[in-house]
């Protein structure tokens, strides 16, 4: 991990693209960066720990320029955060490699290569790739494509790699297995990247590589491509919908703030498919109706924020569609003994569509005999939709901040639409209820905007939170996952320890933490559980805890000493979890501002998790 770029340019200096592309990948998270460029007859390399700008300044100072090169932002997995461990890695002055992923058998490969006389300068698994390719390159008489083909046969794990050779200044070879990689085509220039955001300022014509692909590139495009079976293949070139403007924060201080405020638009765009065409199976794929008619239960697999969206969906699926639903963390599911049901729909959720644990969990489910799969993700042409029989994309647009915001709320919209659609197919929803759900969905962007208007009040709360070291979030029923999401957001970007519990579990342990120094955030909409939540709040107040309550206009809460209340719009029915997500996002954002942390790029975290 975490970002790859590369290019062959016939008429321009490749360093301009490499540094610009790496800066556009900074949002994915990293600890060091580097580039390798064919310059003045040899491969020249610059690596630095810290920001890409430090590395760029060093490259400019050295006067590095050329027409072919590769670059990388690293998020340490094997080996510490040091310059020798940063990419690119070079073998024998001949082969330079950048790599995302993890080579699981790197220790045995390292011993094999050491036995062949190769010396290692780093602790990384990537240096194994460089030496292995160099060895094959020397053995086959200098054929780079074939050297990569042979080398990758030895690797176990996930990888996306880009390779250049000192004596092949017009060839760039790439390979993909389990980690994202694309090829972008310009005029007499060809680019590669792990994310389309890196290339969008230079071209919008992209081809997404698939697992097992190996490609030979020149400045005029893809010269050779083989698939996982070693057979010649082609990958369709598409015009990306992403615009350069979407990759800038505009008038906002941070991408996270921008993306929080983009939620009314993102939700409206995502809901459009249901509002225009209705809750019909065809929204999810051509054969969705027959799949939905045949399934008896649902299994949802996801990680991180997407897992909390899945937990929310469980309530909708069981209450609206009347279908049993089970939710699991993908990284846990893929390593346990599972009883498979071929009539169960497996749903996977991932913002990027490339989350490795989620992808591998889906493959595992299919290997056990699951016949039906549906993915919910935000990135067109990503791996997860290609592996799934059905798909519905969120329309959140590019999300740059590491802490997910609009991707989460648009996932909720899609999952709500799925629940109502399944209810229709199963004949368990009345026309009156369907009309009510449609109207709630239509009004949702406006309700979210009303919640955004609470920002000044929430920012005032944040000044108090900034001085705390821990926080507790409480919710009940379908709002418990929103409490989980609020706690995750706070810990991600403020580094304040935060936990979330169902409010009814207070007496089973968490109440021991409550004192005057522990802020307790309560999600308290005016639903059937409101009186229960109020009773739980009394328990907190009796122990001297300070309560911060996100309520509805009609929840009948009064602010008193030790009880702070902010009222969201009037209760909006089944979609209340979406509206109540916004205040906890804003609380985390403004607390991070008050503490002076890096909002968009919090420490130790990556946007797209493409390794275990």
UniProtKB/Swiss-Prot annotation:
Residues annotated as domain SIS: 288-428, 461-602
Keyword Metal-binding included in the entry's annotation: no
Annotated catalytic residues: 2 (nucleophile), 607 (for fru-6p isomerization activity)
Catalytic reaction equation(s): D-fructose 6-phosphate + L-glutamine = D-glucosamine 6-phosphate + L-glutamate
Gene Ontology molecular-function annotations: carbohydrate derivative binding; glutamine-fructose-6-phosphate transaminase (isomerizing) activity
Gene Ontology, cellular component aspect: cytosol
Subcellular location: Cytoplasm
Broad class of where this protein is predominantly found: cytoplasm
NCBIfam families: glmS, PRK00331.1
Name of the protein described by the UniProt record: Glutamine--fructose-6-phosphate aminotransferase [isomerizing]
Species this protein is from: Neisseria gonorrhoeae (strain ATCC 700825 / FA 1090)
Record lineage: Bacteria, Pseudomonadati, Pseudomonadota, Betaproteobacteria, Neisseriales
């Amino acid at each position: 991990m975490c970002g790859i770029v590369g290019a062959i340019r016939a008429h321009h200096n490749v360093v301009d693209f490499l540094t610009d592309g790496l800066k556009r990948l900074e949002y994915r998270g990293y600890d060091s960066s580097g580039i390798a460029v064919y310059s003045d007859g040899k491969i020249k390399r610059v690596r630095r720990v810290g920001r890409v700008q430090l590395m760029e300044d060093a490259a400019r100072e050295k006067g590095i320029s050329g027409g072919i090169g590769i670059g990388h932002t690293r998020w340490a997995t094997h080996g510490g955060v040091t310059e020798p461990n940063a990419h690119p890695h070079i073998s024998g002055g001949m082969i330079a490699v950048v790599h995302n992923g993890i080579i699981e058998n790197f220790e045995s490969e390292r011993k094999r290569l050491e036995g062949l006389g190769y010396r290692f300068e780093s602790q990384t698994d990537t240096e194994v790739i460089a030496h292995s390719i160099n060895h094959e390159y020397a053995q086959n008489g200098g054929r780079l494509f074939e050297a990569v083909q042979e080398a990758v046969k030895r690797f176990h794990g996930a990888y996306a790699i880009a390779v250049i050779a000192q004596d092949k200044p017009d060839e760039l070879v790439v390979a993909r297995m389990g980690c994202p990689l694309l090829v972008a085509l310009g005029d007499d220039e060809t680019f590669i990247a792990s994310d389309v955001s890196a290339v969008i300022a230079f071209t919008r014509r992209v081809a997404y590589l698939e697992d097992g692909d190996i490609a030979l590139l020149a400045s005029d495009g893809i010269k050779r491509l083989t698939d996982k079976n070693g057979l010649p293949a082609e990958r369709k070139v598409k015009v990306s919908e992403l615009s350069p403007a979407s990759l800038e924060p505009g008038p906002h201080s941070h991408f996270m703030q921008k993306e929080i405020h983009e939620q009314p638009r993102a939700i409206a765009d995502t809901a459009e498919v249901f509002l225009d065409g209705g809750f019909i199976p065809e929204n999810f794929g051509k054969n969705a109706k027959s799949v939905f008619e045949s399934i008896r239960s649902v299994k949802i697999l996801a990680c991180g924020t997407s897992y909390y969206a899945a937990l929310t969906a469980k309530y909708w699926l069981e209450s609206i569609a009347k279908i049993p639903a089970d939710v699991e963390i993908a990284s846990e599911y893929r390593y346990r003994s599972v009883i498979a049901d071929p009539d169960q729909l497996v749903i996977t959720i991932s913002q990027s569509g490339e989350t490795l644990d989620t992808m591998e969990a889906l493959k595992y489910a299919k290997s056990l005999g699951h016949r039906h799969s549906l993915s919910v993700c935000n990135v067109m042409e990503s791996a997860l939709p290609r592996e799934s029989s059905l798909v519905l994309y969120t329309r959140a647009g590019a999300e740059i901040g590491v802490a997910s915001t609009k991707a989460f709320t648009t996932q909720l919209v899609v999952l709500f639409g799925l629940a109502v659609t399944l209810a229709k197919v199963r004949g368990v929803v009345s026309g009156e209820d369907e009309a009510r759900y449609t109207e709630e969905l239509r009004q949702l962007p406006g309700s979210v905007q009303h919640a955004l208007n609470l920002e000044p009040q929430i920012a005032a709360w944040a000044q108090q939170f900034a001085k705390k070291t821990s926080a507790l979030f409480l919710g009940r029923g379908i709002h418990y996952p929103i409490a989980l999401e609020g706690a995750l957001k706070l810990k991600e970007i403020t580094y304040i320890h935060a936990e979330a519990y169902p409010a009814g579990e207070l007496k089973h342990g968490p109440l021991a933490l409550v004192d005057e120094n522990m802020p307790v955030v309560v999600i308290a909409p005016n639903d059937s559980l409101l009186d229960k939540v109020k009773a739980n709040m009394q328990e907190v107040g009796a122990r001297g805890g300070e309560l911060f309550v996100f309520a509805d206009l009609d929840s009948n809460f009064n602010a008193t000493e030790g009880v702070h209340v902010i009222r969201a719009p009037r209760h909006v029915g089944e979609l209340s979890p979406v509206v109540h997500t916004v205040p906890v996002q804003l609380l985390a954002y403004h607390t991070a501002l008050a503490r002076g942390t890096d909002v968009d790029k919090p420490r130790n975290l990556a946007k797209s998790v493409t390794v275990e």
